[in-house]
Structure formats: C-alpha cells, structure tokens
Amino acid sequence: MAKDIRVLLYYKYVPIENAEKFAADHLAFCKSIGLKGRILVADEGINGTVSGDYETTQKYMDYVHSLPGMEDLWFKIDEENEQAFKKMFVRYKKEIVHLGLEDNDFDNDINPLETTGAYLSPKEFKEALLDEDTVVLDTRNDYEYDLGHFRGAIRPDIRNFRELPQWVRDNKEKFMDKRVVVYCTGGVRCEKFSGWMVREGYKDVGQLHGGIATYGKDPEVQGELWDGKMYVFDERISVDINHVDPVVIGKDWFDGTPCERYVNCGNPECNRRILTSEENEDKYLRGCSHECRVHPRNRYVAENGLSQAEVVERLAVIGESLETLVAQ
C-alpha cells in the first residue's frame, strides 16, 4: 500500500545573511503551502525536519533548492502513512547545533565549512565498525543511544550533546592514539563535533556521511550492525534502521524487559526520557524515581485526575509511601 506522507530530514552549513528575516520569510512560505515541521535557522545555516504530502514536500524542496547557497542541499526522505508533525515552527537561533564550546571555556565555536572530520560512506562506516583498531563514538543524547545504536559503539556518560566535549577530554587516553569515527541521526551534529576533535589534535577522525538515516537506506549495507531503533524528534518517536537482522535492545526503565516505548518523566522538573510499557507507566505514575512519583506537580497524576488516596494506593503496591512528599 502506497504511503501518502513524506518526511524530509536535512541540514546545511551555509552563511545566511539576515538570518532572522530569513526565518520569518521561511515560516511564511511553509505555512502558505501547508507544510508541517520544525526548522532551525542561524547565521551558520539551516537544520530541519518537515512533513507533508508528495506535492507539498516537492514544492518545499524546489523552493529550498532555489535559495542562494542551497542548490545542492541534501534531503533525506522517509515515506510514512501519517504526518510527523502537528504544527509548523521556524525559529532563529544563534547556532543550528549548540556544542556549548563558548559556554564552557572551550575557545570559539567550530565552523564545519573550515574544519570537519573525513566523510565515510555507509560501506566505509560498516568497515570501521568491524575494525578492532577503530573507536566508534555515538554523539547523541543518552536516551537516543538507549533505544538503538551501532554494535560496539561507545556510549558517553552524558545527558546531552553539550556535555560531550568535556567527556571526551576527561577520557582522552581512550581515543587520542586511535582512529575515531563518530555518528549521529542525520549528520549535522557530527559535522561540528568531528571538527572539534580535529582541532583538539586527534589525527584520524571520520564521520558517517548523512548519519544513521542514510545508513539505514543504503542498498548495500541495509542498516546491518545497527541494533534497536533510531530515535527521531517528531511524532514517530522511532524508525527502523536494520533491515537484515533487527533486534530490540531498549529496556524498560522499571523492570528491564525489552521495550521501545518512550515517555517523559511525570515530574516537569526532571522530564527525563524513559523507556517503559503502558502498564509500568501506570504502576509507577510515570515517575523515574520515588521523588518524581511523589512530586507535587507530577503530570501523570494531574492528567489522570488521581486523588491523593489513589496515589497512596498505587505507591503502596510498589512498596512506597507519600512520606517524601509530606517532608517537602
């Protein structure tokens, strides 16, 4: 059965004059053709994911390719049955990828047009995965890795991308004398991060060109050596990558059983992304810890209209009480 919706994932590092006005004009065009999605515009370039029917997405690609400096912009296309977004957002930001270098005394930000790692095709990246002398580093957030990753890839002990440079410096002895290849969803983060590694003095740095999204569509590798699913930042939440021997590697936060369903912790001050079944979400009030379960603003409790007596009853089932809440 034909799928009616196309999802476009793309980015391009290219200087954009008057980027704030560009963002406003871009939003107006997207709305005029009925496109949905999320786009970041900065002085350094553009990064977005959008969805629509065939005609709408074709109009959008033609429009982008008509813009100065974007004639060769690479769209990665998924075909889906439903829209991946409900609304259309185009926002101006200082950077399309925030590595946090200037915030953390790491000198100036990286310009990928000047410094970046060597591009690896899916076939070359697969060879790197099988090479014992090559270190493969996942540059995504922890919850993205936990849902799916390349076999043997290192999981940095970080919560978000901005923490990665410091983590690499703290673990420098593991990488400095080895070949290092990095990967991310579509390539935009790796362009900047691999450039930073080159600037740090790493001699042999590579990156998966086009990211995981391209690897999964390559007719030769067919996503092999990828385990689990790829996390995406839209209504789909995840997509398949391995078309050879797929496996589930995600584990339920509460009981460790196989799981690929993500929710945000019910505590708005925590908001951690956790994998869990609907049954365990109900059982644990969508809280990743006791403190989050008994938090006064627990969203699960509010959304389901649970009384305090009902909360106490749920907590008792898992051997907990409201004592922490009372003490706050």
Swiss-Prot record:
Xref: CDD domains: RHOD_YceA (cd01518)
UniProt protein name: tRNA uridine(34) hydroxylase
An MF annotation (GO) of this entry: oxidoreductase activity, acting on paired donors, with incorporation or reduction of molecular oxygen
Function of the protein: Catalyzes oxygen-dependent 5-hydroxyuridine (ho5U) modification at position 34 in tRNAs.
The entry's keywords: Oxidoreductase, tRNA processing
Catalysed transformations (reactions): uridine(34) in tRNA + AH2 + O2 = 5-hydroxyuridine(34) in tRNA + A + H2O
Domain Rhodanese: 130-224
Pfam families in the cross-refs: Rhodanese, Rhodanese_C, UPF0176_N
InterPro entries linked: Rhodanese-like_dom, Rhodanese-like_dom_sf, Rhodanese_C, TrhO, TRHO_N
Superkingdom field: Bacteria
Entry's Gene Ontology BP terms: tRNA modification
Enzyme active site: C184
E.C. number: 1.14.-.-
Entry's family note: Belongs to the TrhO family.
SUPFAM superfamilies reported in the protein's UniProt record: Rhodanese/Cell cycle control phosphatase
